[in-house]
């Protein structure tokens, strides 16, 4: 009895849970009808995006890093720099005393062994050659693929196709996504989060809009007329985050709470302990979100980011921070909406073919094997329902 009851129950459950995949109502919000087999872009329709990683921005950042390194090396060697020119593929550093150039070049080479350098009179030329560019390119594309995948998964999109296309492009197919605006917003932000100390004392440099060495001037996210003079060196960044989620602050409204890993918690604790009374700016993609004053050490490894957020803004920012920062901005170079007209025809034709095939197989089994053939048909049909229900439930 128990064996029969178990078999009948499994078959009934298979029939019930296969219903969503058989009737396939794509627009239904019913939780039960959502448990259906996920169709691909060609059958279900959706969105097609082709993204291009802006590697030029990455190369420029690398050259800026070289420039900062040269300044530090020159200062350590008491060498005066006349001028630094940052071009598209190289930087040219002019020194007052050419006798110290070799020493500076060797020190720089110890830091960046794979970068090409050459001397011309009192100038040091640092180039990003093709080999170095390829290394940066491959690393950036690989990292971008991983982060795009995380962001898409966080958005709830099922069965996306994400793959590299060519040298610096990423192909993205999103079945069932009719309006990809939110996806585009999530992918359009680099989400590079850093924390910097605010220099409130050097008001003359801020008023003159000239950042001294080791400093940078950054706009407020909500008002371009508000500027901050920040220490250029990031004290801790988004790479140390292990969690972020939308939350609600009683005084500031919607916010994003975050938690650091062990290393980040130690850094953040030291920063807040050493700088009580100073302001700490939270910088996202080159603009200041908030710059609160440190009233007491924060040693628990967690904090909260406040701003003029609504619930969706806070949720999206949390998604971006959890997924991690893109190494370089992404540009949408091609966008298409794929209709499901062909898919609907294919599905309808497939259903008709399946029914005709099933009827013919059942007739053949009954004609050849009689009663045993009929029993085999029942088992076959039950098996089909169970497989469809499992595929729909698993997704």
Model-predicted regions and their roles:
Residues 296-298:
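A short acidic/small-residue loop/turn micro-motif
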Residues 1, 257, 261-276, 280-281, ...:
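Interfacial segments of transmembrane alpha-helices in multi-pass membrane proteins
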Residues 31, 38-66:
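Short extracytoplasmic
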Residues 1-45:
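Hydrophobic alpha-helical transmembrane signal-anchor segments
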Residues 256-257, 302-308:
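A short beta-strand structural signal in non-transmembrane regions
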């Amino acid at each position: 009895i128990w064996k029969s009851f178990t078999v009948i129950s499994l078959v009934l459950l298979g029939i019930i849970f296969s219903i969503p995949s058989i009737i396939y109502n794509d627009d239904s919000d019913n939780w039960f009808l959502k448990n259906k087999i996920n169709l691909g872009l060609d059958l279900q329709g959706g969105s097609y995006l082709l993204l291009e990683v802006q590697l030029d921005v990455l190369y420029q950042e690398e050259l800026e890093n070289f420039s900062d390194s040269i300044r530090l090396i020159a200062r350590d060697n008491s060498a005066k720099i006349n001028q630094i020119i940052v071009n598209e593929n190289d930087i040219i550093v002019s020194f007052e005393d050419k006798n110290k150039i070799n020493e500076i070049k060797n020190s720089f080479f110890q830091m960046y062994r794979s970068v090409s350098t050459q001397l011309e009179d009192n100038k040091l030329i640092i180039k990003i050659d093709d080999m170095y560019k390829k290394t940066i390119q491959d690393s950036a594309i690989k990292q971008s693929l991983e982060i795009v995948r995380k962001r898409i998964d966080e958005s709830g999109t099922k069965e996306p196709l994400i793959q590299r296309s060519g040298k610096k492009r990423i192909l993205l197919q999103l079945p069932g996504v009719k309006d990809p605006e939110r996806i585009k917003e999530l992918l359009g932000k680099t989400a590079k989060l850093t924390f910097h100390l605010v220099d409130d004392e050097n008001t003359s440099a801020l008023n003159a809009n000239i950042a001294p060495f080791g400093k940078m001037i950054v706009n407020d996210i909500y008002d371009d007329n508000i500027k901050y003079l920040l220490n250029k060196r990031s004290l801790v960044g988004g790479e140390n985050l292990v969690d972020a989620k939308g939350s609600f602050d009683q005084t500031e409204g919607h916010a994003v709470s975050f938690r650091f890993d062990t290393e980040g918690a130690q850094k953040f604790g030291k920063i807040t302990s050493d700088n009580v009374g100073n302001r700490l700016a939270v910088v996202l993609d080159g603009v200041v979100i908030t710059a609160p004053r440190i009233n007491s050490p924060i040693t628990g490894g967690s904090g909260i980011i406040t701003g003029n957020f609504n619930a969706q803004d806070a949720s999206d920012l949390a998604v971006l921070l959890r997924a991690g920062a893109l190494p370089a901005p992404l540009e949408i170079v091609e966008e298409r909406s794929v209709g499901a007209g062909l898919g609907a025809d294919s599905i309808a034709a497939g259903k008709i073919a399946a029914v005709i095939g099933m009827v013919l197989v059942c007739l053949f089994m009954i004609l050849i094997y009689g009663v045993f053939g009929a029993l085999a048909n029942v088992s076959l049909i039950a098996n089909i329902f169970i497989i469809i229900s499992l595929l729909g439930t698993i997704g």
